[in-house]
């Protein structure tokens, strides 16, 4: 089996975790108490969903997941919520005092008290796996736990499980709206620390999802529940190939092989289509060509940046539902003729396709319409550098005046770590710039063809 362990860190991670596991349960027909009425084989069934759920002797399905937060309130909601019977109590780990939006608290002071307990739980989950494939880590960049504790955890996971892939789903600070003043500090510190430990990080920014909810679903004032449900659809599409059988299945390592041209350039953009409300879906025929086109619209992306200014290095299209390869090939051929979509010159083919016959499931009473087919596009584009540049600029403005730095130093960090992290980010921006530059400039390599 190719099992995956999900680790949800901090408030953002835990709440996205709630949305994701709710959706997985609906997709697999697992009830909130972990029973699966349709499943006849109790015990070691090697159905695909066993990559995400382990089965007890009593026929109960338990998520292979750990929820961690340094303060109790958010995890207490899981402990008392609808799915409280789904999780083993030891999978829900909460501390006593939170990281107070402070990377240093999450990484050094408070984080180190709880890290061994967390690794212990992860080890227990890993021991139940026959062939652990890797970890999915959900967190935000801006929070103290999400940034500080995640980076500590990633470092330790690299030590304990060196070769296993680690994928991140990170909530990137939105350009306009902000949940914390020190977000730029936390984001840059955590990116610097986890850069060498993470194999692939899917970034999502809240503002982009707000706009999608407002524009496509006509929700005037989207709540975090709306955002998380939309996000869980994306996570579900990315992991669908691990949980269901399909025509072209994609596993975790396959993503990395196809999306990450250089180890540092591992921040693909996610785009999902169709995001459409039930009233509208009733009147629309969403063909494969239409939803594929929608993926290349900047408006449907999960991070605010404009790929029309950047170049694509690689692109994964993950279809699910009623989709046949012929339609996909036709849709991709059409896209390749469009001049607005530019690939770097050293990557001529650029499209990887996965097809899964399980149609997308929606949460009853949610905002998304039930559709026959959907697609999630993961693209590695140089436009992500815009997002980094924006963040670096905010960091510079604050750091020039050393604003708020004393909170970090007071928790045992050194000021040198800030400048070191900032230099690393500058290098990352430079890397993106170089990757996008044409390879044949100035030298006569073109003669061989």
From Swiss-Prot:
Keyword list, A-Z: Acetylation, Cytoplasm, Cytoskeleton, GTP-binding, Hydrolase, Magnesium, Metal-binding, Methylation, Microtubule, Nitration, Nucleotide-binding, Phosphoprotein
Active-site feature positions: 254
BP terms from Gene Ontology: microtubule cytoskeleton organization; mitotic cell cycle
Comp. bias regions, Acidic residues: 431-449
Gene3D superfamilies: Helix hairpin bin (1.10.287.600), Tubulin/FtsZ, C-terminal domain (3.30.1330.20), Tubulin/FtsZ, GTPase domain (3.40.50.1440)
PROSITE patterns membership: TUBULIN
Annotated motif MREC motif, positions: 1-4
EC number: 3.6.5.-
Annotated InterPro entries: Alpha_tubulin, Tub_FtsZ_C, Tubulin, Tubulin/FtsZ-like_C, Tubulin/FtsZ_2-layer-sand-dom, Tubulin/FtsZ_GTPase_sf, Tubulin_C, Tubulin_CS
Residue ranges, annotated region (Disordered): 429-449
Annotated site, Involved in polymerization, chain positions: 449
Binding residues annotated for Mg(2+), in chain numbering: 71
Broad class of enzyme this protein falls into: hydrolase
Name this protein carries in UniProt: Tubulin alpha-1C chain
Gene coding for it: TUBA1C
């Amino acid at each position: 089996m190719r099992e995956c362990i999900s680790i949800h860190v901090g408030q953002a991670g835990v709440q996205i975790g709630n949305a994701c596991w709710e959706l997985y349960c609906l997709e697999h027909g697992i009830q909130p108490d972990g029973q699966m009425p349709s499943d006849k084989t109790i015990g070691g069934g090697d159905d695909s969903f066993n990559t995400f759920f382990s089965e007890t002797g009593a026929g109960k399905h338990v998520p292979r997941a750990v929820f961690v937060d340094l303060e109790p309130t958010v995890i207490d909601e899981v402990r008392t919520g609808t799915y409280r019977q789904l999780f083993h109590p030891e999978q829900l780990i909460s501390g006593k005092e939170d990281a107070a939006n402070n990377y240093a608290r999450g990484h050094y002071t408070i984080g180190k008290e709880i890290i061994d307990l967390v690794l212990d739980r992860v080890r227990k989950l890993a021991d139940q796996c026959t062939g652990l494939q890797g970890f999915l880590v959900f967190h935000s960049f801006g929070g103290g736990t999400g940034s500080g504790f995640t980076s500590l955890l990633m470092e330790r996971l690299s030590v304990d499980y060196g070769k296993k892939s680690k994928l991140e789903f990170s909530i990137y600070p939105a350009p306009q709206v902000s949940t914390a003043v020190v977000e730029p500090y936390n984001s840059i510190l955590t990116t610097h620390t986890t850069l060498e430990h993470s194999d692939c990080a899917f970034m999502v920014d809240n503002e982009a999802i707000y706009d999608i909810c407002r524009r496509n679903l006509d929700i005037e004032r989207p709540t975090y529940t709306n955002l998380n449900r939309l996000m869980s659809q994306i996570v579900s599409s990315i992991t669908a190939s691990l949980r269901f059988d399909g025509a072209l299945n994609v596993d975790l390592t396959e993503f990395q092989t196809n999306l990450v041209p250089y180890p540092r350039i591992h921040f693909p953009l996610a785009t999902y289509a169709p995001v459409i409300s039930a009233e509208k879906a009733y009147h629309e025929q969403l063909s494969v060509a239409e939803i594929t086109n929608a993926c290349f619209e900047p408006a449907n992306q999960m991070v605010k940046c404009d790929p029309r200014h950047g170049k694509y290095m690689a692109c994964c299209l993950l279809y699910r539902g009623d989709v046949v390869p012929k339609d996909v090939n036709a849709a991709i051929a059409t896209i390749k003729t469009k001049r607005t979509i530019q690939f770097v010159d050293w990557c001529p083919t650029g499209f990887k396709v996965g097809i899964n016959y399980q149609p997308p499931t929606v949460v009853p009473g949610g905002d998304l319409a039930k559709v026959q087919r959907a697609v999630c596009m993961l693209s590695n584009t140089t436009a992500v550098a815009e997002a980094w540049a924006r963040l670096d600029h905010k960091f510079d403005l604050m750091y020039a005046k050393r604003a708020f730095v004393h909170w970090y130093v007071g928790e045992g960090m050194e000021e040198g770590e800030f400048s070191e992290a900032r230099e690393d980010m500058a290098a990352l921006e430079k890397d993106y710039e170089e990757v996008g530059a044409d390879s044949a400039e100035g030298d006569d390599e073109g003669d061989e063809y």
